[in-house]
Structures are given as structure tokens and as C-alpha cells.
Amino acid sequence: MKAQTIEVTESTGRILCCPIFRSGGKKLLAKGHLMCDEDIRILQSEGMENIWVTELEEGEIGEDDAVRAIASDIICGCFEVKITAGGRANLLATENCCVLVDDDLLKQINCTSSLVIATVLNFSYAQAGQRIATIKSAPFAVAKSDLDGLAALLKQRGPIMQARPLRTPTLGVLYCDPISGERARQMFESIMRQRLERFSIPTPVSLSCVEEEEQVVRSLHSLLRHRPALILVASSTAPAGPEDVVGRALARVGAQLERFLTPVEPGNLMMLAYRDDIPIVSAPGCFRSTKPNVVDLVMPPLLAQYRISTWELACLGHGGLLA
């Protein structure tokens, strides 16, 4: 691709390298515009004689075609692609969803490609219609070899992103307190409602009990029979580890501990376990506050039926200082 200044009369079929404005300041033609005969007549009527343009050479693909070619390959799930002028593709969620991002692959592409990609954070909750990523090409054109290399990398490594829908998931909640389960319910229920409204989650299946091992075990078994997408244990006492009352109860119902302690503040004392494919979160004390905490970070992927690993919890430490 070679930019040059030529006579306006010779510019048909070439790409405008800079915007053109009328004398009064109103934009006449945008950068990247493909010139046609009508444009030439307009510019001549404005008294212009020369124009700065470029044209595609063999082995090059126009900026809009380049982002269009790759947009659907970087993501899977509930999304749509919107192409805008100037070599940009926006990816929008078509349903309420959780966005998962392969950070290593994203960095690799952004270091080596003639296209760059910006996304929302991994594990982000997105509402239908929200922009979750944008792709921008180098100005005017991209080498076909670059595009082919990017396509091959995505075919080998898979998409950079997933938009996993949250389709009215069922949530189970267990309120517990050493003295009275209803005391914990009164302490948490209003806050729980506000938190669930953020994610458009319907009214959960909820139980309350005294924080005593046998009662917690019975309550967990009862909630598990509903097959919820997620069970939250909201206790008036902060988790103390797998040997506390809730931790022992989790083991007795067959749940496997994934991780106790998370590098997120507020929320260091969260405990995550799985009973088969059902995640169970023993919420830390900060859950009593409406302010963002670790539970807000892990709820979207868990509600989208994504199994969070210990490694992924560890990765939350970068940016995990929320307050």
C-alpha cells in the first residue's frame, strides 16, 4: 500500500488517506472513504485540485473486510458482530451472559497482529446489547498473510472469548447462624436481593438453619435436590477453612473442595467447592455489604455453568484489590 498525492480527477476507486472538510468546517468525506465519480464532482465543486489517497496492492485486504473476516472467529456463544467505518468491528452480547477471555492468547495476538482486540475483563457480566469487545485494524489495509496467520492461530488455539448465556439460572441460598438461621436471613436477605438484581437472577430457593453440622448437611442435601446452578452459603460467621462447620458439612454431602482463600479483597476468605457439577460457595463476611467483593466476581461464570479452577481464582489477584 502506497499513499500519494494525485489529482482529484484520478482518484476514483482509491482510498482517502485523511478527512476532507468544507471551508466552514463541516466534514465532507471521512478518512478511509472509497472514492467514486460523484465524490470527484463534489470535490471539484469545492475547488479542490489534489487529494491524498492510497490503494490496495496485491496481497492486501481492506480494513473493513479484514475485521469482518476475523470477528466471528475470535468468539463463541451469544454474540453479534457490528462493522463500523474505519476498520472496526464491535462484538455485542445478544443475551445476558458471562464473558470469558483467554488472556494469554489475547496478548499474543495484540503483540503480533495487524489487528488489535480490546475486551471486557474475564468473568465480566454483560447485559444483552452491551459491547463486550472491539477489533481495530491497521489503517486502510492488512496483509493477507497476517490475516491468514491469525486465522490459523485461532483454529489451533480456539476462540479468544466465550459469551456464555445466563438463561434464568436457579440459585440456592442457605442462611446460617450459630444462634438462629432466621437471624442470618434477616441480616443477608435484602443485600442478597440487591446483588441478584445486578445479574437479573430470579428469586432463589432459600433455606435457613442454625450453624450446626447436622443441620447444615440436611439443608445442603435439600438444596441439591433442586439442581441449582449455584449454591451460596451466607453465614453470619466468616469461613475459617475446610474444618469449620460449613467446610465439614460440604465434605459430608460429597462436595470436593476447590479452594479456600482467594486473592481478592474484600473476599479473601471465600471457600469454593463442587458437588459433581454444582458449585457451592461459602461466602466471606464482606458478603453482608453491597459493595463489590469476590462473590460478585465469581457469580457470573458459576451461574453460566463454567467450572472455575484454582488457577483461575489465583489469577484474580491481579486487580483483585477492589477496595
Descriptions of predicted regions:
Residues 48-49, 86, 128-130, 167-171, ...:
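Short coil/turn connectors at secondary-structure junctions
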Residues 45-49, 72-79, 128-137, 197, ...:
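Generic secondary-structure signature for well-ordered alpha-helical cores
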Residues 1-145:
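Phosphate-interaction motifs
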Residues 139-230:
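Phosphate-binding glycine-rich loops and their immediate beta-loop-alpha structural context
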